């Protein structure tokens, strides 16, 4: 799991038994896969188009879910644990860390 540069931009991927799968929502211009847990949930950041700011994503059971921190211009997930708690960074006029999980959201300054 990680990302590669194709000469123009980055794209997330998952490597499993020498087989590589691109991890990127349909239509996205770029992605970064940054974390994975033991339930195979992958988290990271993608840009919906070349002019867009980054949005966080989760990828689980072949489904992408996008996430934008409230009032943020940029959001990314960096890690996820086995409970589905996610850590990330966001820009809301300044850079903040945050922790999000099922039913909660906590900003860290």
Task: Give the role of each language-model region.
Residues 1-109:
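Residue-level hotspots at or immediately adjacent to binding/recognition sites across diverse folds
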């Amino acid at each position: 799991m990680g990302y590669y540069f194709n000469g123009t931009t980055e794209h997330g991927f998952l490597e499993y038994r020498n087989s590589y799968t691109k991890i990127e929502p349909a239509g996205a211009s770029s992605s970064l896969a940054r974390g994975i847990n033991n339930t195979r949930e992958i988290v990271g950041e993608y840009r919906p188009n070349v002019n867009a700011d980054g949005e966080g994503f989760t990828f689980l059971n072949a489904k992408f879910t996008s996430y934008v921190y409230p009032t943020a211009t940029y959001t990314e997930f960096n890690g996820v644990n086995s409970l589905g708690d996610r850590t990330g960074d966001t820009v809301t006029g300044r850079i903040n860390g945050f922790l999000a999980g099922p039913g909660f959201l906590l900003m860290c300054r």
